[in-house]
Amino acid sequence: MKETDREAVATAVQRVAGMLQRPDQLDKVEQYRRREARKKASVEARLKAAIQSQLDGVRTGLSQLHNALNDVKDIQQSLADVSKDWRQSINTIESLKDVKDAVVQHSQLAAAVENLKNIFSVPEIVRETQDLIEQGALLQAHRKLMDLECSRDGLMYEQYRMDSGNTRDMTLIHGYFGSTQGLSDELAKQLWMVLQRSLVTVRRDPTLLVSVVRIIEREEKIDRRILDRKKQTGFVPPGRPKNWKEKMFTILERTVTTRIEGTQADTRESDKMWLVRHLEIIRKYVLDDLIVAKNLMVQCFPPHYEIFKNLLNMYHQALSTRMQDLASEDLEANEIVSLLTWVLNTYTSTEMMRNVELAPEVDVGTLEPLLSPHVVSELLDTYMSTLTSNIIAWLRKALETDKKDWVKETEPEADQDGYYQTTLPAIVFQMFEQNLQVAAQISEDLKTKVLVLCLQQMNSFLSRYKDEAQLYKEEHLRNRQHPHCYVQYMIAIINNCQTFKESIVSLKRKYLKNEVEEGVSPSQPSMDGILDAIAKEGCSGLLEEVFLDLEQHLNELMTKKWLLGSNAVDIICVTVEDYFNDFAKIKKPYKKRMTAEAHRRVVVEYLRAVMQKRISFRSPEERKEGAEKMVREAEQLRFLFRKLASGFGEDVDGYCDTIVAVAEVIKLTDPSLLYLEVSTLVSKYPDIRDDHIGALLAVRGDASRDMKQTIMETLEQGPAQASPSYVPLFKDIVVPSLNVAKLLK
């Protein structure tokens, strides 16, 4: 208390100090005192009121507790009186057991009386129900069946209530109504038959289907009522619950499965297109059935049955099972394509599930895949493996067929521009196109894989093609009379290389997206290289053919016979031009290279004739005559190859200029200028060697040994550097060593 008083005094002092901060506030002390007195009186009044209220509550509570105590005592006394009365009336209650039994018996008899009419008429109702079922009057039959079951179930329930352990009476009642279960089963069979043909029935007689649904719905209500009573009494009549709604969906599901499986009319042995036909029948049947279900069947079923949704799921599951079964068979490559195209594309297309007549109830996005990704992957792997084997076999067969054409006695066909060709490129790329078009129907990814496969196999195929072309050339060289049209078919082989190149580019442009092109492009340089090699070998073989015919005339060059008036170069020009009339059938890129190579080789052979020292001029007159003949023949060759190279837009004079330059060395009349002339020759043609110079001087026939030695030693000190565009002519010309040794002596 003292502590509280001290705190109150301290608080008061603090409040007074807060009020009297300035001198002028002392004048208001009396005013402050009265205000605080009023506050104190107000607080004390509220405090007294609160205390009084608490006291009143305590007083009321004590009064109520006192009343409750009195009530408890009264209840205690009443319970004692009841207990006393109960003990006194036990004997009286036991004497009323007979009354209780009589009441139960009365209840049973009342139920029996109530069902008496039905009990006596059971056989008649059974016959009528059977007749109605046979007549197809299903609703009336079900009404009578319900009456029979109601009578049976009512009697059995009363017996169960009276004596649940009395199985004899229960069996007696059940036996008396024994035909009821048979009628129920017979009616169920009729219902299931209607449901199995529901898609037909709903179009011909929708009322019948509605009757079936009404019967099932009635049975569902009875099942629910009986199950509710079971929770209270434990009694369930025989044959309940029937679960006809669940059985209805089971029947529909089995019907859908049978319908899907029954669409396969053919086998692989009887029809190669069995799977395509099977899948098309499935597509048509499923689409028609779902349209009927959406437009007609939904009108015959209660909304909560969700009949269309359930049928859609049934068809989807049945299709998935069927596709799994088909996928597990040993399918051929074309059959795998047909299956995957149908599963991945057709099924979700407007031809089937996206059909406008099924919208908006069918949402393709919510449907699970018909085949799992694992199965699809396995099928694709099998397809790629089979396709690889097939492509290898097809390419091998195509090449063998083409090889047979190479030995024919007739010329190959020409394209619209007159270039020789065989059917090989067309056959190969037609086969590639077909497989790529098929793969594109399945997916972009598979199309890319097939394209990569085709290009890979094309690479291997071109290597075999190159080997076969080489063998073809070698066999011809062993017997130049066979094959008869060797030149024409070799031209066709060369042209095929260009066709292959163009077809590869076209194929990639058509079937390859830009973003994946980089992954496939590395095969292109390899194939281009092989094709160029094949064409180069082919051109080389054709030129070999030319130079075999020219060999005799080339050997006449730079000989006494040549100097005396041989027409070898005339024959060479005529022969080359004649061959190039055939070579006009070669496509431009390769013909251009071939013309340049023929020009180079003719000039090289001419220079080789010079370097082989077939002639040694004995006088300035002979040197002049020989040199002038060389210049004339160089011009003759220049004219020929200008004619052959017309349209190529290239300078063809350089090679023949070499012959003229060599002729100038031979023609020189002042031996003192020989070193200068030779130096000029070497600077123009850096690949010329000292043995070439020695042979050239030997052909002149007037160079002394010292002059030869001086020229060669001087040239060895400062070899000329070749320009990047220079095409070597002398490096392949071999000078007989015996001749060089003699010259140096």
From Swiss-Prot:
Residues annotated with N6-acetyllysine modification: K28
**A GO biological process held by the record:** exocytosis
Entry's Gene Ontology molecular function annotations: cadherin binding; SNARE binding
> Per UniProt, what is one Pfam family of this protein?
Sec6
Q: In which tissues is it expressed?
A: Expressed in epididymis (at protein level).
Highest rank taxon of the organism: Eukaryota
Q: Which GO terms describe its cellular component?
A: cytosol; exocyst; Golgi apparatus; growth cone; midbody; perinuclear region of cytoplasm; secretory granule membrane
Q: What does this protein do?
A: Component of the exocyst complex involved in the docking of exocytic vesicles with fusion sites on the plasma membrane.
Family according to the record: Belongs to the SEC6 family.
- Subunit structure, per the record? The exocyst complex is composed of EXOC1, EXOC2, EXOC3, EXOC4, EXOC5, EXOC6, EXOC7 and EXOC8. Interacts with EXOC3L1. Interacts with BIRC6/bruce. Interacts with MYRIP. Interacts with SLC6A9.
| Protein name (Swiss-Prot/TrEMBL) | Exocyst complex component 3
Gene name, Swiss-Prot/TrEMBL: EXOC3
